[in-house]
Amino acid sequence: MLQVKDTLRATVQVSFDGRVYKVYHGPDAPKRFDNEVRILRHLEARRCGFVPRLLEADPSKLRIVTTNCGVRVEHLDAERLRELFAELEGFGVRHDDCDMRNVTYRQSDGRFCVVDFELATILPGFE
C-alpha cells in the first residue's frame, strides 16, 4: 500500500485496488472516527456524489475503508474552493476545515471532491 498521509491524528494509505484506508490515532481518535463515519453515512444517504463512499468501518481498529476520490489538488482558485464547500453545505454538512488539502480531483468524471470529515458537522435541520 502507498502511504499518503501520516500525522499525529491519522495515517492514510491507498491500496493497489484503489481503496483508501484511514486509521485514527492521537487525541480523541474514537470520537473523530465516529464522527467521520456518521458524516459519510449522512452524505451517502443524500447521494452526495463528490465525497468518498464508506466501504468499511472497524471501531475496534479505529479504521475506515473508503472509495478513492482521486489525487490531491495543488492549485485551486479561492472562489472555486468556496463554491465547493458551499455545495457540500447544500447536503447539510459543514466541513470545518475548508482547506485545499481536503480537496481531490477525480479524473474519471472531471470532478473536484472533498475528503477528510473527522471534524465536520451536520447542520441544524439536516439531522
Where are these regions (language model features)?
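Conserved structural core of kinase catalytic domains
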Residues: 25, 29-33, 37, 41-84
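ATP-binding glycine-rich loop module of kinase domains
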Residues: 1-42
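Hydrophobic residue at the +6 position relative to the catalytic HRD Asp in the kinase catalytic loop
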Residues: 98-105
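Structural motif
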Residues: 15, 58-60, 106-108
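Short hydrophobic-acidic sequence motifs that mark active-site Asp/Glu residues
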Residues: 12-14, 20-22, 51, 65, ...
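C-lobe/activation-segment region of protein kinase-like
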Residues: 90-94, 106-127
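Acidic active-site catalytic centers that drive phospho-/nucleotidyl reactions
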Residues: 36, 97, 116
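Short, glycine/acidic-enriched loop or turn micro-motifs at the edges of active sites
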Residues: 70, 100, 119-121
